[in-house]
Amino acid sequence: MRLLDYFLLTEGGNVEAINFLGKSKFADKIDLGRIKIKNFRTEFSQLFLDLNKKFKSKFKYPLWGDESIIKSGFVFNGSTSYIMDPNINADEILKFKTHAGDIDIMVPSESMSDLWLLLRELEGKKVGKNFTYFGNNKPNQNALGTQINAIFVFHHSSGDINCQIDFEASEFENDRPTDFAKFGHGSSFEDARVEIKALHHKYLLRCLVSVVSANPNIIVATPASTAEKIKLKKTQDTPKMYGFSVDRGLGYSLEPIIGKDGKIVEIDGKQVYKEKKTDDKKYIKDLSEIFRFLFNTDNNFSKFYSFVGLVDLLKLYCDKETIKKVQKSYFRLLFGDKSQVIESFDPKSDCIVKMKGYNYFLEKLNLKHPNLDNDVNHYYEVRKNAFRKKI
């Protein structure tokens, strides 16, 4: 069944930036019809080229060594990747994408700390032709993580717009983002055409990896467990041998606990494993290798880059039992009691974004979800305090 009718998708624009004077701003949604996409491309390209110039002047090396990746749109992630792509017709984009919540741009991971220092100096100053830098949500260099979420005020002729720019720490080779860096945070225009947000592609990948790598013949102990002292994890889930991270790739999640005899410890006939520390996991970033792991084929690889394509791949290569397990995992990731809120100010918008992907999944795979309305309503009742109010 369909819970919601079609809506045009809006996204992002949730960040609050606080500058070093203690003043704050929330990001606005950027109306692409008002700004005009061709103008959007020109203005933001110039902004990043100017920022690159300032960065090189301060640190004696460029933030982006190959500026052609700005002009071509290659350095951008999420929906920004196709909004900024000069090869995609602007009018065609506007049919399916009326607003931009943020601008996602990749930055070499090793340059993030220097970028933060530069931004600190630029507070309240002009950058590009029509922007003033306001601030970001990272109070110091130790809090950077994988993103700097900043606000630049765009002085447009129709009025100021607080634009959220997410600088994403990414892996670069030869001054360009790697294939996996693009894949891990990318967004497909094919998905935008059916008004489905990129997060659904990554969510579905995570679910598929967990289902394909599930191993009911092992049990999982706590990370601190040893062969002499084993404490089992309190979970009802089937253990998963692998996990998927948009930043790191396909990771081997578990390691066996080895006894004094050199063999894997067993309890009740099941081998005992424990979770590896994140830094100790081995990750696979080769996309063709990840594809073969999931589907046991090299065919139709091009479908791997979009949610729409991934649903097609499930239909082509996965049996009904696997698909049902993926459905259960996917719904729980969207609407489990601790699931992430996507639109932090508006439960209705959050529901629209999530149901777009889930309804498409059900329809294309000919699946049903009894009592879907009740299950979704339960989530919003449980998570009602997770939604913020704009001040």
Model-derived regions, located:
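Acidic side chains
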Residues: 11, 102-104, 166
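Metal-dependent nucleotidyltransferase catalytic core
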Residues: 37-53, 93, 97, 106-164
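Active-site nucleotide-donor binding segment shared across nucleotidyl transfer reactions
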Residues: 48-116
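Structural alpha-beta junctions
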Residues: 53, 57-58, 124-129, 207-218
